[in-house]
């Protein structure tokens, strides 16, 4: 439900939904799925330090989640921690050396771009800015 809220541009409601999911099932092996959504939503709202925390928990829950490394790099960059951002982006780039911000944005999900709200698209620009700051080429 949180991802639906996120794509509809109801970002604050998405945060509430992701937090509710975590309160209900904090030991669920798939916990990383809503934690990455929480991290993304928090970043979109400008709560970058909280996003770093959620995305670190995402990576603790699923260390192999490659896209999470890039999202964590973006959040770290937005907090001003460029050293941490570059480290996480380097880990991501080792597996995806040709990734660009444009390609990353296009791969965001299986939801068609015209099905997401303008609010979601606008707020997602913060994440792409974080990726650029971390060193991902346009």
Residue ranges of each PLM-predicted region?
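Alpha-helical protein-protein interaction modules
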Residues: 2-138
């Amino acid at each position: 439900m949180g991802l639906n809220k996120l794509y509809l541009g109801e970002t604050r409601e998405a945060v509430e939904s992701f937090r509710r999911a975590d309160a209900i099932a904090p030991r669920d092996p798939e916990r990383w799925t809503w934690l990455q959504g929480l991290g993304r939503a928090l970043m979109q709202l400008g709560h970058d330090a909280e996003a770093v925390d959620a995305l670190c928990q995402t990576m603790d829950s699923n260390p192999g989640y490659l896209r999470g490394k890039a999202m964590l790099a973006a959040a770290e960059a937005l907090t001003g921690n460029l050293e941490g951002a570059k480290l996480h982006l380097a880990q991501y780039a080792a597996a995806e050396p040709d990734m660009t911000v444009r390609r990353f944005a296009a791969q965001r999900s299986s939801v068609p771009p015209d099905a997401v709200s303008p609010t979601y698209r606008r707020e997602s620009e913060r994440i792409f800015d974080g990726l650029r700051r971390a060193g991902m080429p346009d």
